[in-house]
Protein backbone atom coordinates (compact mmCIF):
# COMPACT_ATOMS: atom_id res chain seq x y z
CA UNK A 1 0.00 0.00 0.00
CA UNK A 2 1.44 3.37 -1.05
CA UNK A 3 0.35 5.65 1.79
CA UNK A 4 2.07 8.76 0.42
CA UNK A 5 0.63 8.45 -3.08
CA UNK A 6 3.99 8.82 -4.80
CA UNK A 7 4.31 12.42 -3.59
CA UNK A 8 7.83 13.73 -2.92
CA UNK A 9 8.69 16.68 -0.68
CA UNK A 10 8.76 19.19 -3.56
CA UNK A 11 5.20 18.29 -4.50
CA UNK A 12 4.17 18.38 -0.85
CA UNK A 13 5.24 21.98 -0.36
CA UNK A 14 3.79 23.19 -3.65
CA UNK A 15 0.46 21.61 -2.68
CA UNK A 16 0.54 22.98 0.88
CA UNK A 17 1.18 26.50 -0.41
CA UNK A 18 -1.74 26.20 -2.80
CA UNK A 19 -4.17 24.72 -0.27
CA UNK A 20 -3.34 26.75 2.85
CA UNK A 21 -1.91 29.96 1.34
CA UNK A 22 -1.94 32.70 3.97
CA UNK A 23 -2.57 30.36 6.91
CA UNK A 24 0.26 30.45 9.46
CA UNK A 25 2.66 27.56 8.92
CA UNK A 26 5.65 28.42 11.10
CA UNK A 27 6.22 30.58 14.16
CA UNK A 28 9.75 30.84 15.53
CA UNK A 29 10.72 32.42 18.85
CA UNK A 30 14.37 33.13 19.66
CA UNK A 31 15.93 33.08 23.12
CA UNK A 32 15.66 36.88 23.11
CA UNK A 33 11.93 36.69 22.46
CA UNK A 34 12.14 37.79 18.81
CA UNK A 35 9.30 36.20 16.85
CA UNK A 36 9.34 35.41 13.12
CA UNK A 37 6.23 34.13 11.38
CA UNK A 38 5.57 32.59 7.97
CA UNK A 39 2.42 31.57 6.12
CA UNK A 40 2.36 28.38 4.06
CA UNK A 41 2.74 30.44 0.88
CA UNK A 42 5.58 32.62 2.18
CA UNK A 43 7.40 29.65 3.73
CA UNK A 44 7.27 27.85 0.38
CA UNK A 45 8.77 30.95 -1.24
CA UNK A 46 11.62 30.98 1.30
CA UNK A 47 12.19 27.29 0.62
CA UNK A 48 12.34 27.95 -3.14
CA UNK A 49 14.77 30.84 -2.67
CA UNK A 50 16.99 28.58 -0.59
CA UNK A 51 16.82 25.81 -3.19
CA UNK A 52 17.94 28.32 -5.83
CA UNK A 53 20.74 29.51 -3.54
CA UNK A 54 22.09 25.98 -3.27
CA UNK A 55 21.81 25.54 -7.03
CA UNK A 56 23.78 28.78 -7.55
CA UNK A 57 26.51 27.32 -5.33
CA UNK A 58 26.80 24.25 -7.53
CA UNK A 59 24.64 21.83 -5.55
CA UNK A 60 22.83 19.25 -7.67
CA UNK A 61 20.69 16.18 -7.11
CA UNK A 62 22.43 13.65 -4.86
CA UNK A 63 24.91 16.15 -3.40
CA UNK A 64 25.17 16.33 0.38
CA UNK A 65 24.98 19.58 2.35
CA UNK A 66 25.58 19.80 6.10
CA UNK A 67 23.62 22.01 8.50
CA UNK A 68 25.14 22.90 11.87
CA UNK A 69 22.47 25.14 13.36
CA UNK A 70 20.46 25.70 16.48
CA UNK A 71 16.70 25.93 15.97
CA UNK A 72 15.91 28.67 13.47
CA UNK A 73 13.69 29.20 10.39
CA UNK A 74 16.74 28.84 8.15
CA UNK A 75 16.98 25.19 9.16
CA UNK A 76 13.48 24.65 7.74
CA UNK A 77 14.35 26.62 4.58
CA UNK A 78 17.46 24.49 4.01
CA UNK A 79 15.87 21.15 4.88
CA UNK A 80 13.12 21.43 2.30
CA UNK A 81 15.09 23.59 -0.14
CA UNK A 82 17.62 20.80 -0.50
CA UNK A 83 14.84 18.23 -0.87
CA UNK A 84 13.23 20.25 -3.67
CA UNK A 85 16.34 19.93 -5.83
CA UNK A 86 17.04 16.33 -4.87
CA UNK A 87 20.03 17.17 -2.67
CA UNK A 88 20.61 15.54 0.70
CA UNK A 89 20.59 17.23 4.10
CA UNK A 90 23.18 16.13 6.67
CA UNK A 91 22.18 17.75 9.97
CA UNK A 92 24.91 17.96 12.61
CA UNK A 93 24.17 17.93 16.30
CA UNK A 94 24.76 21.51 17.45
CA UNK A 95 26.58 20.26 20.56
CA UNK A 96 29.30 18.45 18.64
CA UNK A 97 32.86 19.74 18.70
CA UNK A 98 35.47 19.98 15.96
CA UNK A 99 36.75 16.42 15.69
CA UNK A 100 33.24 14.96 15.91
CA UNK A 101 31.87 17.32 13.26
CA UNK A 102 34.86 16.78 10.98
CA UNK A 103 34.30 13.02 11.18
CA UNK A 104 30.70 13.44 9.94
CA UNK A 105 31.79 15.77 7.12
CA UNK A 106 34.41 13.28 6.01
CA UNK A 107 32.14 10.26 6.40
CA UNK A 108 29.34 11.80 4.33
CA UNK A 109 31.63 13.63 1.86
CA UNK A 110 30.09 17.06 2.42
CA UNK A 111 31.55 19.98 0.47
CA UNK A 112 29.09 22.72 1.55
CA UNK A 113 28.05 23.68 5.07
CA UNK A 114 25.41 26.08 6.41
CA UNK A 115 26.13 27.30 9.93
CA UNK A 116 25.94 30.33 12.21
CA UNK A 117 28.59 32.71 13.51
CA UNK A 118 28.99 30.90 16.84
CA UNK A 119 30.14 27.70 15.13
CA UNK A 120 32.20 29.34 12.38
CA UNK A 121 35.61 29.36 14.15
CA UNK A 122 35.45 25.58 14.51
CA UNK A 123 34.74 25.09 10.80
CA UNK A 124 37.38 27.58 9.76
CA UNK A 125 39.92 25.33 11.48
CA UNK A 126 38.43 22.24 9.84
CA UNK A 127 38.75 23.83 6.39
CA UNK A 128 42.33 24.89 7.09
CA UNK A 129 43.23 21.33 8.10
CA UNK A 130 42.12 20.05 4.67
CA UNK A 131 41.01 16.84 6.38
CA UNK A 132 37.51 16.93 4.86
CA UNK A 133 36.00 17.78 1.44
CA UNK A 134 34.48 20.98 2.91
CA UNK A 135 35.27 23.90 0.60
CA UNK A 136 32.45 26.40 1.11
CA UNK A 137 30.52 27.76 4.09
CA UNK A 138 27.23 29.65 4.03
CA UNK A 139 27.13 31.74 7.18
CA UNK A 140 24.00 32.98 8.93
CA UNK A 141 24.72 36.15 10.89
CA UNK A 142 25.08 39.90 10.73
CA UNK A 143 28.79 40.10 9.92
CA UNK A 144 30.74 38.11 7.38
CA UNK A 145 34.42 37.27 7.98
CA UNK A 146 36.84 38.24 5.22
CA UNK A 147 37.65 34.63 4.39
CA UNK A 148 37.66 32.90 1.03
CA UNK A 149 35.00 30.27 0.55
CA UNK A 150 32.48 31.97 2.85
CA UNK A 151 29.22 33.57 1.73
CA UNK A 152 26.43 35.37 3.56
CA UNK A 153 23.38 33.10 3.60
CA UNK A 154 20.69 35.75 4.15
CA UNK A 155 22.04 38.25 1.61
CA UNK A 156 22.40 35.66 -1.14
CA UNK A 157 19.17 33.83 -0.33
CA UNK A 158 17.05 37.01 -0.33
CA UNK A 159 18.18 37.85 -3.89
CA UNK A 160 17.01 34.51 -5.31
CA UNK A 161 13.83 33.98 -7.30
CA UNK A 162 10.80 32.41 -5.62
CA UNK A 163 10.40 30.20 -8.69
CA UNK A 164 12.55 27.08 -8.79
CA UNK A 165 15.21 27.22 -11.49
CA UNK A 166 16.29 23.57 -11.14
CA UNK A 167 13.69 20.80 -11.00
CA UNK A 168 15.29 17.39 -11.52
CA UNK A 169 13.09 14.32 -11.60
CA UNK A 170 12.39 13.14 -8.06
CA UNK A 171 11.20 9.83 -6.66
CA UNK A 172 9.91 9.09 -3.18
CA UNK A 173 12.72 6.51 -3.04
CA UNK A 174 15.36 9.26 -3.34
CA UNK A 175 17.45 9.99 -0.25
CA UNK A 176 16.42 13.23 1.46
CA UNK A 177 18.60 13.08 4.55
CA UNK A 178 21.46 11.30 6.28
CA UNK A 179 20.89 11.68 10.01
CA UNK A 180 23.73 10.54 12.23
CA UNK A 181 22.73 8.76 15.42
CA UNK A 182 23.70 10.26 18.76
CA UNK A 183 26.55 7.81 19.26
CA UNK A 184 26.23 7.51 23.05
CA UNK A 185 28.25 4.26 23.02
CA UNK A 186 30.29 4.40 19.78
CA UNK A 187 30.84 6.34 16.57
CA UNK A 188 27.52 7.57 15.14
CA UNK A 189 26.02 5.80 12.13
CA UNK A 190 24.43 7.66 9.23
CA UNK A 191 20.75 6.73 9.01
CA UNK A 192 19.55 7.10 5.40
CA UNK A 193 16.08 8.68 5.21
CA UNK A 194 14.09 8.94 1.97
CA UNK A 195 11.41 11.31 0.72
CA UNK A 196 8.93 8.49 1.36
CA UNK A 197 10.12 8.15 4.96
CA UNK A 198 9.47 11.82 5.66
CA UNK A 199 6.10 11.93 3.90
CA UNK A 200 5.02 8.77 5.73
CA UNK A 201 6.20 10.25 9.04
CA UNK A 202 3.94 13.24 8.48
CA UNK A 203 0.84 11.14 7.92
CA UNK A 204 1.64 8.57 10.61
CA UNK A 205 2.47 11.02 13.41
CA UNK A 206 -0.53 13.20 12.51
CA UNK A 207 -2.70 10.08 12.90
CA UNK A 208 -1.05 9.21 16.21
CA UNK A 209 -2.05 12.52 17.80
CA UNK A 210 -5.21 13.06 15.71
CA UNK A 211 -3.73 16.31 14.36
CA UNK A 212 -5.97 18.77 12.48
CA UNK A 213 -5.41 22.02 10.62
CA UNK A 214 -6.67 24.04 13.60
CA UNK A 215 -4.01 22.57 15.92
CA UNK A 216 -0.91 24.41 17.10
CA UNK A 217 2.07 22.09 17.64
CA UNK A 218 4.82 23.64 19.79
CA UNK A 219 8.23 22.04 20.26
CA UNK A 220 11.56 22.83 21.87
CA UNK A 221 13.23 19.70 20.48
CA UNK A 222 16.29 20.43 18.30
CA UNK A 223 15.55 20.61 14.59
CA UNK A 224 18.53 18.39 13.79
CA UNK A 225 16.88 15.53 15.72
CA UNK A 226 14.43 12.92 14.42
CA UNK A 227 11.81 13.83 17.05
CA UNK A 228 11.50 17.42 15.90
CA UNK A 229 11.50 16.47 12.25
CA UNK A 230 9.24 13.41 12.16
CA UNK A 231 6.97 13.66 15.20
CA UNK A 232 6.52 17.44 15.19
CA UNK A 233 7.38 19.34 11.98
CA UNK A 234 6.30 16.78 9.38
CA UNK A 235 2.91 15.98 10.99
CA UNK A 236 2.22 19.66 11.65
CA UNK A 237 2.88 20.64 8.04
CA UNK A 238 1.18 17.55 6.60
CA UNK A 239 -2.01 18.36 8.52
CA UNK A 240 -1.92 22.07 7.70
CA UNK A 241 -1.39 22.92 11.37
CA UNK A 242 0.71 25.74 12.80
CA UNK A 243 4.20 24.65 13.84
CA UNK A 244 5.78 26.64 16.68
CA UNK A 245 9.54 26.17 16.95
CA UNK A 246 11.34 27.59 20.00
CA UNK A 247 15.07 28.20 19.83
CA UNK A 248 15.84 26.68 23.24
CA UNK A 249 14.00 25.08 26.14
CA UNK A 250 13.41 27.16 29.26
CA UNK A 251 11.54 25.62 32.18
CA UNK A 252 10.66 29.10 33.45
CA UNK A 253 9.24 30.25 30.11
CA UNK A 254 7.68 27.01 28.85
CA UNK A 255 4.11 27.37 30.14
CA UNK A 256 3.97 31.07 29.25
CA UNK A 257 4.93 30.07 25.70
CA UNK A 258 2.28 27.33 25.65
CA UNK A 259 -0.32 29.95 26.59
CA UNK A 260 1.10 32.67 24.31
CA UNK A 261 0.78 30.53 21.19
CA UNK A 262 -2.33 28.64 22.39
CA UNK A 263 -0.53 25.37 21.72
CA UNK A 264 -2.75 22.30 21.59
CA UNK A 265 0.04 19.72 21.24
CA UNK A 266 3.61 19.62 22.50
CA UNK A 267 6.27 17.04 23.26
CA UNK A 268 8.32 16.41 26.40
CA UNK A 269 11.23 14.27 27.49
CA UNK A 270 11.80 13.25 31.13
CA UNK A 271 14.35 16.01 31.75
CA UNK A 272 11.75 18.61 30.78
CA UNK A 273 9.07 17.11 33.02
CA UNK A 274 11.43 17.00 35.99
CA UNK A 275 12.59 20.60 35.55
CA UNK A 276 9.02 21.81 35.05
CA UNK A 277 8.00 20.12 38.28
CA UNK A 278 10.62 21.99 40.34
CA UNK A 279 9.28 25.36 39.17
CA UNK A 280 7.15 27.19 41.76
CA UNK A 281 3.47 26.26 41.58
CA UNK A 282 1.31 28.97 39.99
CA UNK A 283 -2.44 29.61 39.69
CA UNK A 284 -1.98 29.45 35.90
CA UNK A 285 -0.55 25.90 35.90
CA UNK A 286 -3.73 24.48 34.38
CA UNK A 287 -4.62 27.46 32.21
CA UNK A 288 -3.69 26.23 28.75
CA UNK A 289 -5.16 24.56 25.65
CA UNK A 290 -2.94 21.46 25.52
CA UNK A 291 -4.82 18.30 24.66
CA UNK A 292 -1.82 16.02 24.13
CA UNK A 293 1.76 15.90 25.40
CA UNK A 294 3.83 13.52 23.29
CA UNK A 295 6.13 11.74 25.72
CA UNK A 296 9.31 9.73 25.26
CA UNK A 297 10.85 7.32 27.78
CA UNK A 298 11.41 7.10 30.74
CA UNK A 299 9.49 8.27 33.82
CA UNK A 300 8.41 6.72 37.10
CA UNK A 301 4.71 6.33 37.88
CA UNK A 302 5.02 8.84 40.73
CA UNK A 303 6.59 11.45 38.45
CA UNK A 304 3.97 10.87 35.77
CA UNK A 305 1.06 11.15 38.22
CA UNK A 306 2.44 14.30 39.84
CA UNK A 307 2.97 16.00 36.47
CA UNK A 308 -0.41 15.14 34.97
CA UNK A 309 -2.25 16.13 38.15
CA UNK A 310 -0.49 19.45 38.59
CA UNK A 311 -0.77 20.65 34.99
CA UNK A 312 -3.99 18.93 33.97
CA UNK A 313 -2.49 17.21 30.94
CA UNK A 314 -2.21 13.64 29.73
CA UNK A 315 0.87 11.98 28.30
CA UNK A 316 0.74 10.17 24.97
CA UNK A 317 3.58 7.66 25.11
CA UNK A 318 5.53 7.06 21.91
CA UNK A 319 8.41 4.62 21.45
CA UNK A 320 10.80 4.76 18.53
CA UNK A 321 14.32 5.64 17.43
CA UNK A 322 16.06 7.29 14.51
CA UNK A 323 15.94 4.06 12.52
CA UNK A 324 12.17 3.65 12.94
CA UNK A 325 11.57 7.27 11.80
CA UNK A 326 8.45 7.58 14.01
CA UNK A 327 7.04 6.21 17.27
CA UNK A 328 6.17 2.76 15.94
CA UNK A 329 4.76 1.65 19.29
CA UNK A 330 2.61 4.07 21.25
CA UNK A 331 -0.73 5.14 22.58
CA UNK A 332 -3.44 5.40 19.96
CA UNK A 333 -5.96 8.18 19.40
CA UNK A 334 -9.01 7.56 21.57
CA UNK A 335 -7.70 4.38 23.18
CA UNK A 336 -7.46 3.84 26.92
CA UNK A 337 -3.86 4.23 28.07
CA UNK A 338 -2.22 1.53 30.16
CA UNK A 339 0.70 3.06 32.06
CA UNK A 340 3.54 2.05 32.20
CA UNK A 341 2.95 0.38 28.85
CA UNK A 342 4.53 2.11 25.87
CA UNK A 343 1.37 1.27 23.92
CA UNK A 344 0.57 -0.97 20.98
CA UNK A 345 2.15 -1.29 17.57
CA UNK A 346 0.99 1.31 15.05
CA UNK A 347 -0.54 0.80 11.62
CA UNK A 348 1.68 -0.64 8.86
CA UNK A 349 4.09 -2.19 11.40
CA UNK A 350 4.52 -5.51 13.16
CA UNK A 351 6.28 -6.02 16.50
CA UNK A 352 7.59 -9.07 18.34
CA UNK A 353 9.60 -9.89 21.44
CA UNK A 354 12.46 -12.26 20.52
CA UNK A 355 15.03 -14.26 22.46
CA UNK A 356 18.78 -14.42 21.86
CA UNK A 357 18.23 -17.07 19.18
CA UNK A 358 15.87 -14.69 17.33
CA UNK A 359 12.78 -16.75 18.24
CA UNK A 360 9.47 -15.07 19.15
CA UNK A 361 8.66 -15.15 22.88
CA UNK A 362 5.20 -15.51 24.45
CA UNK A 363 3.46 -12.77 26.43
CA UNK A 364 5.13 -11.87 29.70
CA UNK A 365 8.66 -12.96 28.77
CA UNK A 366 11.43 -10.38 28.40
CA UNK A 367 13.43 -10.27 25.18
CA UNK A 368 14.48 -7.91 22.40
CA UNK A 369 11.88 -5.62 20.85
CA UNK A 370 11.89 -6.26 17.08
CA UNK A 371 9.96 -4.22 14.54
CA UNK A 372 8.94 -5.10 11.01
CA UNK A 373 8.60 -2.33 8.47
CA UNK A 374 9.50 -1.54 4.87
CA UNK A 375 13.07 -0.22 4.48
CA UNK A 376 13.12 3.20 2.87
CA UNK A 377 9.40 3.64 3.44
CA UNK A 378 8.21 2.98 7.00
CA UNK A 379 11.67 2.43 8.50
CA UNK A 380 15.10 3.70 7.51
CA UNK A 381 16.65 2.54 4.27
CA UNK A 382 20.16 1.64 5.49
CA UNK A 383 23.19 2.92 7.35
CA UNK A 384 25.18 5.14 5.01
CA UNK A 385 28.18 3.25 3.58
CA UNK A 386 27.96 0.62 6.34
CA UNK A 387 26.47 -2.56 4.82
CA UNK A 388 27.68 -4.78 7.67
CA UNK A 389 26.04 -2.60 10.33
CA UNK A 390 22.87 -2.53 8.22
CA UNK A 391 22.85 -6.33 7.97
CA UNK A 392 23.27 -6.68 11.75
CA UNK A 393 20.32 -4.41 12.50
CA UNK A 394 17.99 -5.14 9.59
CA UNK A 395 16.90 -8.56 8.36
CA UNK A 396 16.10 -9.05 4.64
CA UNK A 397 12.39 -9.46 5.47
CA UNK A 398 12.34 -6.00 7.09
CA UNK A 399 12.70 -6.98 10.76
CA UNK A 400 14.67 -4.36 12.68
CA UNK A 401 16.53 -5.33 15.85
CA UNK A 402 16.15 -2.36 18.21
CA UNK A 403 18.64 -3.44 20.87
CA UNK A 404 15.97 -2.71 23.50
CA UNK A 405 14.59 -5.17 26.05
CA UNK A 406 10.87 -5.39 26.67
CA UNK A 407 7.83 -7.64 26.85
CA UNK A 408 4.17 -7.60 25.86
CA UNK A 409 1.03 -8.59 27.72
CA UNK A 410 -1.86 -10.77 26.57
CA UNK A 411 -3.67 -7.76 25.08
CA UNK A 412 -0.79 -6.72 22.83
CA UNK A 413 0.46 -3.83 24.96
CA UNK A 414 4.24 -3.50 25.00
CA UNK A 415 6.46 -2.61 27.95
CA UNK A 416 9.97 -1.17 27.74
CA UNK A 417 12.52 -2.61 30.17
CA UNK A 418 15.84 -1.07 29.13
CA UNK A 419 18.42 -0.75 26.43
CA UNK A 420 20.07 -4.16 26.27
CA UNK A 421 23.44 -2.47 26.59
CA UNK A 422 22.17 -0.86 29.82
CA UNK A 423 21.47 -4.16 31.54
CA UNK A 424 23.98 -4.66 34.36
CA UNK A 425 25.15 -8.21 35.02
CA UNK A 426 25.70 -8.55 38.75
CA UNK A 427 26.57 -11.93 40.22
CA UNK A 428 24.43 -13.86 37.74
CA UNK A 429 21.49 -11.44 37.93
CA UNK A 430 20.40 -9.02 35.20
CA UNK A 431 19.65 -5.58 36.63
CA UNK A 432 17.82 -2.90 34.64
CA UNK A 433 19.29 0.58 34.95
CA UNK A 434 15.91 2.10 34.09
CA UNK A 435 14.18 0.20 36.88
CA UNK A 436 16.68 1.45 39.46
CA UNK A 437 16.56 5.01 38.11
CA UNK A 438 12.77 5.06 38.41
CA UNK A 439 12.92 3.87 42.01
CA UNK A 440 15.69 6.24 43.08
CA UNK A 441 14.10 9.24 41.33
CA UNK A 442 11.23 9.01 43.82
CA UNK A 443 13.54 10.26 46.60
CA UNK A 444 12.32 13.78 47.45
CA UNK A 445 15.83 15.26 47.48
CA UNK A 446 16.88 13.90 44.09
CA UNK A 447 16.31 15.88 40.88
CA UNK A 448 18.17 13.66 38.40
CA UNK A 449 19.69 10.18 38.48
CA UNK A 450 21.57 7.77 36.26
CA UNK A 451 22.83 4.29 37.07
CA UNK A 452 25.79 2.62 35.36
CA UNK A 453 27.68 -0.64 35.66
CA UNK A 454 31.37 -0.59 36.52
CA UNK A 455 33.81 -3.48 36.47
CA UNK A 456 33.86 -5.72 39.54
CA UNK A 457 36.36 -8.56 39.94
CA UNK A 458 33.93 -10.64 42.01
CA UNK A 459 30.43 -9.99 40.63
CA UNK A 460 31.19 -9.05 36.99
CA UNK A 461 29.76 -5.57 37.49
CA UNK A 462 29.04 -3.27 40.40
CA UNK A 463 26.31 -0.63 40.34
CA UNK A 464 27.09 3.06 40.64
CA UNK A 465 24.54 5.88 40.89
CA UNK A 466 25.28 9.44 39.75
CA UNK A 467 22.89 11.90 41.39
CA UNK A 468 21.88 15.54 40.98
CA UNK A 469 20.15 16.97 44.05
CA UNK A 470 17.39 19.54 44.20
CA UNK A 471 18.69 23.04 44.90
CA UNK A 472 19.75 23.52 48.52
CA UNK A 473 19.51 19.83 49.44
CA UNK A 474 22.14 17.56 50.96
CA UNK A 475 22.15 13.76 50.98
CA UNK A 476 24.50 11.50 52.92
CA UNK A 477 25.65 8.12 51.65
CA UNK A 478 23.97 6.44 54.62
CA UNK A 479 20.65 8.12 53.81
CA UNK A 480 20.93 7.19 50.13
CA UNK A 481 21.80 3.53 50.69
CA UNK A 482 19.10 3.18 53.35
CA UNK A 483 16.50 4.45 50.87
CA UNK A 484 17.68 1.95 48.26
CA UNK A 485 17.71 -0.98 50.69
CA UNK A 486 14.12 -0.22 51.68
CA UNK A 487 12.87 -0.02 48.09
CA UNK A 488 14.64 -2.70 46.05
CA UNK A 489 16.05 -6.20 46.24
CA UNK A 490 19.45 -6.45 47.90
CA UNK A 491 21.28 -7.44 44.71
CA UNK A 492 19.98 -4.27 43.00
CA UNK A 493 21.24 -1.83 45.64
CA UNK A 494 24.07 0.34 44.21
CA UNK A 495 27.53 -0.15 45.65
CA UNK A 496 28.61 3.41 44.97
CA UNK A 497 27.03 6.84 44.67
CA UNK A 498 28.39 10.18 43.46
CA UNK A 499 26.70 13.57 43.69
CA UNK A 500 27.13 15.89 40.70
CA UNK A 501 25.89 19.33 39.72
CA UNK A 502 24.64 17.99 36.36
CA UNK A 503 24.77 14.98 34.06
CA UNK A 504 26.16 14.89 30.49
CA UNK A 505 23.35 14.74 27.93
CA UNK A 506 23.00 14.60 24.18
CA UNK A 507 20.63 16.71 22.09
CA UNK A 508 17.59 14.57 22.85
CA UNK A 509 18.13 14.67 26.60
CA UNK A 510 19.60 11.18 26.83
CA UNK A 511 22.41 10.85 29.34
CA UNK A 512 25.76 10.02 27.74
CA UNK A 513 26.78 7.12 29.95
CA UNK A 514 30.17 6.60 28.33
CA UNK A 515 31.22 9.94 29.89
CA UNK A 516 30.45 8.57 33.35
CA UNK A 517 32.14 5.19 33.25
Curated annotation (Swiss-Prot):
Top-level lineage group: Bacteria
CDD domains for this protein: FACL_DitJ_like (cd05934)
Pfam name, any one: AMP-binding_C
Gene3D superfamilies: 3.30.300.30, N-terminal domain of ligase-like (3.40.50.12780)
Example of a GO MF term: carnitine-CoA ligase activity
Pathway: Amine and polyamine metabolism; carnitine metabolism
SUPFAM superfamilies: Acetyl-CoA synthetase-like (SSF56801)
Reaction(s) this enzyme catalyzes, per UniProt: 4-(trimethylamino)butanoate + ATP + CoA = 4-(trimethylamino)butanoyl-CoA + AMP + diphosphate; crotonobetaine + ATP + CoA = crotonobetainyl-CoA + AMP + diphosphate; (R)-carnitine + ATP + CoA = (R)-carnitinyl-CoA + AMP + diphosphate
BP GO terms, sorted: carnitine metabolic process; fatty acid metabolic process
UniProt keyword Oxidoreductase present: no
Enzyme Commission number(s) of this protein: 6.2.1.48
Keywords: Ligase
Matching NCBIfam families: PRK08008.1 (NF005947)
Record's function text: Catalyzes the transfer of CoA to carnitine, generating the initial carnitinyl-CoA needed for the CaiB reaction cycle. Also has activity toward crotonobetaine and gamma-butyrobetaine.
Name of this chain's protein: Crotonobetaine/carnitine--CoA ligase
